Amino acid sequence: MNESKLTFNLELDENNVPKKIIMNSSDNQAKDVSLKSVMIAAWDETTKETLRVDLWTKDMMVNEMFIMYHQTLISMANTLSKSTGQDKLAGALRDYCEFFAQETKIIQSNQD
């Protein structure tokens, strides 16, 4: 059986806020990748709940967070469509992504 390990090393400040996040993988697909943020969601099959780890460094700007959220939501819509065939629900999520992007001003409105 093949195995691969993904690790995140954190350098914390005196208040335990991440100053640095470094990602590595045992298969060398990721080697010392410097991250400003990481969001991990995992499904606990026993409790039927999503477990979450959300970390970001002090130097991550709000606009960068908006872009990350937008890209994550788009990816979730694509995965929803691909994995379940629920294109209508995925489309609704994409519509929300458009609204989110306009409200956060990470993209220009077609009406501007």
Where are these regions (language model features)?
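Structured beta-strand/loop patches that form or line metal/cofactor-binding pockets in enzymes
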Residues: 1-8, 31
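Short hydrophobic/aromatic patches at helix-to-coil boundaries
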Residues: 3, 12, 108-112
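Active-site and channel-lining beta-strand-loop segments
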Residues: 6-25
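Short alpha-helical interface elements
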Residues: 16, 60-67, 94-105
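Active-site- and interface-proximal helix/loop "cap" or "latch" segments in soluble metabolic
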Residues: 19-85
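C-terminal charged interaction modules
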Residues: 78-112
